[in-house]
Amino acid sequence: MDYLTDVTGRSSRVLRGTVNRLWYGHRQVRFQDCLQDVQRENMARPPQALRSDTGQRKTLEKKDGRRMSFQRPKGTMEYTVESRDSLNSIALKFDTTPNELVQLNKLFSRAVVPGQLLYVPDPDYISSVESSPSLSPISLLSPTSSEAEFEKRTDTERMPHKESTSSPAYSTTRQSRVVSSTSEEEEAFTEKFLKINCKYITDGKGIVTGVLLVTPNNIMFDPHKNDLLVQENGCEEYGIMCPMEEVTSAAMHKEIVNSKLKDSIPVDVDQLSCMREFCHFKKISPGNLHDLDSKMWDAGNDSASTAPRSTEESLSEDVFTESELSPIREEHLSSDELRQDKSSGTSSESVQTINQNISECSVNISDCADASDDVKGSLEPSGNDSGIVSSINDLERSESSMNVGDGLDKDISESSIVLTEANEGQAESKGSKNNCNDGNLADNQTGDQNHSREAAVVGNHRHEALQEKTLKQSFGDSETEAEELRKFWKDLTMQQAKQQREDMQHTTQKEIKGKMPTAETHIEGVCSSVAKEKRRHRTHRYLCLRVGKPMRKTFVSQASASMQQYAQRDKLEYWFAVPHERSDHLYSFFIQWSPDLYAEELGESAREPGFVVVKKNEEGESSDRSTNDSASRLWEVVSVAEYHRRIDALNTEELRTLCRRLKITTREDVNSKQATNIKHDQEPESFRPNLSDPSSLLQTEQIEKLTKHLPPRTIGYPWTLVYSTAKHGMSLKTLYRLMLGLDTPVLLVIKDSDSQIFGALASEPFKVSDCFYGTGETFLFTFCPDFEVFKWTGDNMFFIKGDMDSLAFGGGGGEFALWLDGDSYHGRSHTCKTFGNSILSKKEDFIVQDIEIWAFE
């Protein structure tokens, strides 16, 4: 140890030169001669301290000699490893991969220790070339959609950030070596895959948000665990993966062109807000008019005053948004307001409506009049806005009705001037409140001008009677006069309110009945215009992937995935809604990182790209692809095999068109016509198998229908009657005994007491088993009332289950699709997930009359 402390400056220079030769010349390596500092400190300390601190100095020397701090790459931030962190968990926190963290931090292994400083991708970093369609590392790695950025920000806010701070003593005395990072390595690594936040549009199972991962070898979609459909149905339904060599076509569309998939989606995402408002308005039916009037009346009485206001909103943005229209405001839409909306919809000006402010309380009549004057002044009638003039007339009638209330309040105040100051204040506040109620009723009233005049005359007569009564009792006791005045005023107000309410109900009912079709038509037109406007600024494009084999489920076992892949063998098209700015990234990725076709005989120079861009004039199969498909498609890349197939189909179609134009009959056309005729002649005979014994349950037509759905390995073999209740009796044990030695599918035919024919095809002979057995060839059928076949759905593998006392087909949810007891006498049929069937018989429980089992050998 003393030898280590006596290292001279010459040995330090030799060590530094050796390290410089080991590291590349383009990297700037700077060492601080820490050993000299340690030597000076040791000379100043006593020998005992040197001996006791030998282990600590050795550890410090190793740490200082190996300390490295890389220059932080662009788009990254510092993160300190915590006690329970691993490289995988850190990558999951920052929405990246462990391999990327290894590349960014130049790690030699995936092991991390608490307190270690790592560079992780910064979610708030915005690249200057992000808007470019070229494949930059940041644009490829980090999603650029607003939804993805919002999710990343929320995740980083929840996660505690710890800045690594070095000790001041070490920072002044030591200099760490700085290794400059090479951006070529990160670019070469990060450009090899795309990670896009998108939505998977399923066929009948909803739309799920998740991450689409595109690599040169695979395409995989992982759903978000926070999605409502994922929480309800589980990840097994939505996680899919496909090898890149199975992709035959990748196309980007403006809208979904698959008619079946488009019909299964309820409404476009951009039209949801508009349609919600329209559906809410359509709930106002003539049967609900009475409830509507009640709500209007209660709202008017609960509020102390009405403050008409003018709201200026844009038709294309806020008129039909859910945040602006509250349920109370929707219920207060009158026919005049609908007329205003319709008349102003043809012009470019904003819509101005008059509405009630129910939330304000205790506002006097002068404020209401001022607000009415403001609204009246702000509504300037134009040539096209004829509905606004009628609204101004309604305001004038409302003000005239309010003036009647003002005069009535004035006379009452003069007649009761002898009251005390306290009673006078109570009477004034009571009168002011009732004045506001009268004004509210008059403002809500939608009758004509004659009805308003009649209401004013009635109010004047009652006002005169009230004035006479108050003058006669003016010399009585002041408190008694106040109580009687309040009581009489209350009775008068209730009678007048009841009459006005009845008149208003009749008038409002007639007007809303007349204006309902017009209002619905207007709102539908506005919704369509809003939908068209938003369609221009749609933020999503639709990626259509066509594959040669169905995609595999990623969250199930390999056996289940293979079985489900076989069950969904007809599903060869998948749709994803991706952000529009990622369309160019996908296009460039498919062109650059496509799998190659290796031609061994021609060598390395004969390689062709795995995907080829399809041009407009190279589109074959015009009958299969509609004009709408070509119009909405932005771009499409196909595999080389698909490209050659389309070119051949296009050339064949052009040749046929030319022959048709020249009226030339080719040999293929003649052969196809002859083959069609022969097929029609021989079709009944080809589907009529040979039976070893005549069937007492199946007719000839029923046998032909069943033969069309049998597995291919049964075609051409004669039908052999293995078991029949007429010959062998009704015993399940006898059935199992007769099945021994068979190795073919078997057909079970049942006839119940209602003379209904149904049954099942089993992929294997019936036997006693501990669990379910069979394959996806198993299916159910029924002739009750019409012929129908129920194939395997792929949800589970509960095909056949044999016991000594029962025989069952299908399962899931505690119910069997078809069940027979040990005596083959009682049976039951129920819907199940295995086959997605309905009840095979007329009733759920049935009695077996006869059974036949046929084998194919």
Swiss-Prot record:
- Residue ranges under compositional bias (Polar residues)? 343-353, 381-393, 432-449
Question: Does Heme appear among the keywords?
Answer: no
Domain TLDc, chain residue ranges per copy = 696-857
Q: Name one GO cellular component term.
A: nucleus
Pfam families to which the protein is assigned, alphabetical: LysM, TLD
- A GO biological process held by the record: response to oxidative stress
Instruction: Report the residue ranges that make up the LysM domain in this protein.
Output: 77-120
Q: Where's it mainly located?
A: mitochondrion
Q: Which Gene3D superfamilies match?
A: LysM domain
Q: Which UniProt keywords apply?
A: Mitochondrion, Stress response
Q: Does the keyword Mitochondrion apply?
A: yes
What is this protein's function per UniProt? May be involved in protection from oxidative damage.
Protein name in the entry? Oxidation resistance protein 1
Q: Which organism is it from?
A: Xenopus laevis (African clawed frog)
